[in-house]
Regions:
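Alpha-carbonic anhydrase
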Residues: 1-258
């Protein structure tokens, strides 16, 4: 394998896809360190309001403006436009994440969904193998609240009922802005949506180190109600089998440009 950014990213783009989520054994992953750092542009510092919505199955964030954050670098060829952020969780602190790293489960998992800028929209991108890029953060429940989540948690309190929404600022995403994530290692693989229609169109990027969230903060997420006015207890898809020849790459990142 040639040691160049283009050859490596092209090889990742040609990896065989699988259904998602999956259980990942880090010791079995090929380890690469020559990728360009991931670059997150305009996520919490663009002074644009967003909408936080309880859509009956999850808490869902999107920006009101057509000016969207951009993700580039790492395993991605080209730029990917931010579409939405959402959460997966369960009733306990160990089965609320969708991906498992070395068998470890966490309280929740947050997905930042992007579509390839060469396609006109999210809907158009879903029909292509390189259509989407999803960045996943595992959320670990701890006793003390994480002040970085305060703005977002305030929104959770306002959207307890299904189809309720509230306007929030881009600062609601500022919990991403930490040294751990700027230099965080991650795994990447070609996979699918974890919700219907489960299309295999996603380049997954899952950070290895979990993000801490207070148990009380997490409790507000678990109080969100579905259409039947009953709390959403679980919105996690079970892990799927790796097909023969499927690869997951461990990336030792030098420094992300957040």
């Amino acid at each position: 394998m040639k040691n160049s950014k283009m050859s490596i990213t092209e090889q990742i783009s040609r990896l065989r896809p699988s259904q998602s989520p999956i259980a990942i054994s880090l010791s079995r992953c090929p380890k690469w360190s020559s990728l360009d750092p991931l670059q997150f542009k305009g996520y919490w510092d663009n002074e644009v309001n967003g909408i936080l919505l309880n859509n009956g199955s999850t808490a869902y964030f999107t920006f009101e403006s057509d000016v969207r954050p951009i993700l580039r670098g790492g395993p991605l060829l080209g730029e990917y436009i931010f579409e939405q952020m959402h959460f997966h969780w369960s009733v306990d602190d160990f089965s609320g994440c969708e991906h498992l790293l070395d068998g470890q489960g966490y309280a929740a998992e947050c997905h930042f969904v992007h579509y390839n800028s060469k396609y006109e929209s999210m809907e158009a991108a879903v029909g292509h193998p390189d259509g989407l890029a999803v960045v996943g953060f595992l959320l670990e429940a701890v006793d003390a609240p994480n002040p970085r989540f305060d703005r977002l948690v305030e929104g959770f309190e306002m959207i307890k009922k299904s189809e309720h929404s509230v306007r929030v600022t881009s600062e609601s995403l500022s919990w991403m802005d930490s040294d751990d994530l700027q230099e965080g290692n991650y795994v990447t693989y070609k996979g699918s949506l974890t919700t219907p229609p489960y299309t295999e169109c996603v380049t997954w990027i899952i950070y290895e180190k979990p993000v801490e969230i207070g148990t009380e903060q997490l409790g507000l997420l678990r109080q969100l109600e579905g259409p039947n006015s009953i709390p959403i207890e679980r919105n996690v898809r079970p892990t799927q089998r790796h097909p023969p020849g499927h690869s997951v790459i461990y990336v030792n990142q030098i420094k992300s440009k957040l």
